[in-house]
């Protein structure tokens, strides 16, 4: 499946947040406020202009990707920019709509920026913590063409691919997301995912990711 069919997969809606259930676990899709997108991009550009700070915050050695640059966000910025509040409110609403009741705690473990350019990729992997997600701060106007003409398959250049379980009768095992500037996707930490390379442009695909903990009462709802 792909984001083109997400409207058919919505479990419930509340304003801009949509809870999507393409397979076992639910995921959530929410539009970031424009002010937050600007704050995050301004912060990234500020870090990029400071070589010493870029080196200090470098996170590339800790992550799976073959990409140009990955660096951590500073806690002070996470707390003061509205980003932490956005994540907390979105996760709480997602889990409530998904039937998991009230979440009493939300603690960010880490958050980082990924700067990806043509021919770069992120291999299949998963995260730590309890909940994770990715949002898009900049995307190219085009992700390039495929070498062979496509028939009934969509162009997945630059896509985020979520993977869960195995493909069986009446059971899809993957969900492909075409990045759009300003949209954030939330998923459980164990959700395997990969990012495909793109071609045909020198523009940046800039994303932001996080790992967080919620209270154990909510996370271990089915026991430890």
Where does each model-flagged region fall?
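A domain-level signal for the structural core that forms small-molecule/cofactor-binding pockets
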Residues: 207
